[in-house]
């Protein structure tokens, strides 16, 4: 093992309390210690930040970290200072005291990590000052933001190359969790003065269970799902502020501790709700998709989407906020015909270049394809990022597999109804017509006399709604323009209607609970802990929450769940035994070790 990597491993243990690197970290850290420029594509929760933190501690030189996420920068500064590392942040919300503190450390040559927003890096000659202070390394987080092909393009990231030039010939490290090949190539071209090493690790997050469900009383579906995780933290994403507040109220009425979070709330309310989410267990935040960007909370146990995401990258990034501690986490995504139609209209109405519109449409179609995947969800998700895998065995489809069947005849009934009604009516109307529902509109329009009226009485109404949604996803029908869009046949739809093509679809069926879900419902909420150890784990969580409130920090900055679980297993009652717990470094041992050892001893003495 190279000497510098051995030193990094020693610091990993003494400072952070971990015995070894996470999978994939070692090779990236080794390249960084050699001085190589690099781009690392690593899944959320794999420990990307450690790949620039450790090199800064090994060589003692200043590392400048660029991030668009102010909350994440603040959290990382708190985390670094909690383990004795000199770190600071400069961004648009920095207080006068924070700015003074950063410059004091910088001038004294003591600063190891400076977190800055991309726009701040070019303000008031900051890059030049950092060059004079001996900045040796530039680390760029969320590097996909520089690419026009990425799902989260930010124009200010285009200026990072200019800032890097002002810093001098510094080593450049770029990190992202979501970048397909086109995005990676764009990042390399725009951020690096020379060809970097590129590390692309698996996108798989095997600790996260993937579930999708067609919308059917979505508030009830979400409440029932979240009820299983009453003592755990989670995030529910909604597409609008109004839906966010309404759903938070619904969950609260069901006895859950739900808080809304969106840009329309005043800053004080947002800050209070975010602090409760970070400091307490069992809080559910119902939010617009902006929430969670930069929320460095490793013990989020579930993420729900009340509405279908716009693209696979956003979906992957948002579910990636669950289970960052490597422990089991769950997800649920609800989707429906209205979601698909709305997302398509939003793209069509955007004032963007045609090439960008084409890319966004392709990304949306991939998201719709994931919702309607006929086989393993994880396999389909990884395939989108160019990664081959076998069936995972525990997503919703693997756990309750429903075979794909030839649906051509049923599709023809729907398509015929669309054609015979003049392509003027929406999905609900067509489903009523085929199912034989004599609603007033159908009677008024004389459509009870059509051959297709009641042609599908042998199936429930919901089955026809589901079939129409899948036909829409498959591109057999689209929507007409106008205030009240109706369904119309596409070329593919006409080919199916007239028998030139067939179509296979997956019938709707209730999903069976996965093995992991049944285990959770039957016993311990933490995989691998027996009930008595879980009681100790919850006791330690309560102590952690108390300390977090005392210090005004996020609970995981005291200790993450993974460390508390190890404590519950090992049951250390003195500082010597506490040293063996994963995640307890020397600084935290001194700060918290005695209180937690006392708590373990008191619990065991009961």
Model-derived segments and their meaning:
Residues 1-8, 359-361, 388-606:
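Accessory DNA-binding and partner-docking regions appended to nucleic-acid-acting proteins
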Residues 168, 230, 374, 423, ...:
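Flexible coil/turn residues that form the inter-helical turn or adjacent wing/linker of helix-turn-helix
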